[in-house]
From Swiss-Prot:
Function: Neurotoxin that paralyzes freshwater crabs at high concentration.
Residue pairs linked by disulfide bridges in the UniProt entry: 40-51, 43-58, 75-86, 78-93
A single Gene Ontology CC term: nematocyst
Locations listed in the record: Secreted; Nematocyst
Protein's name according to its UniProt entry: U-stichotoxin-Hau2b
Taxonomic lineage of the native organism: Eukaryota, Metazoa, Cnidaria, Anthozoa, Hexacorallia
Site, Cleavage: residue positions: 29-30, 64-65
Family from the record: Belongs to the sea anemone BBH family.
Pro-sequence residue ranges: 19-29, 30-33, 62-64, 65-68
Keywords: Cleavage on pair of basic residues, Disulfide bond, Hydroxylation, Nematocyst, Neurotoxin, Repeat, Secreted, Signal, Toxin
Signal sequence region: 1-18
Length: 96
């Protein structure tokens, strides 16, 4: 009678401690994002596991104002600037 009691005790212990089986296909897990530590700061943003420079965020791609063409030394006296040249101004100097 003892062997039957021991077998029954083991069987009942297994039933009490049994855990439900989990099918991995049914269980959906959200993937953890790859976060860089420390995170990308300033002019950089994260792509995968790397920090990439953002030229638009930091103003590297700005429309630059064209510099005026200034003659050095500037036109003086009876001359005025037209483009990159000094042109004689006959009205300014009283030649007319």
């Amino acid at each position: 009678m003892k062997p039957i009691f021991i077998v029954a005790l083991l069987f009942s212990t297994c039933l009490v401690n049994a855990k439900p089986s989990i099918d991995d296909a049914e269980m959906k897990r959200e993937p953890k994002p790859n976060i860089i530590n420390p995170p990308c700061i300033g002019c950089y943003y994260q792509v995968g596991n790397e920090c990439v420079y953002d030229k638009f965020k930091c103003g590297a791609v700005r429309k630059r104002e064209p510099k005026p063409n200034i003659i050095n030394p500037p036109c003086i006296g009876c001359y005025y600037q037209v483009g990159n040249e000094c042109v004689y101004d006959k009205f300014k100097c009283g030649a007319v």
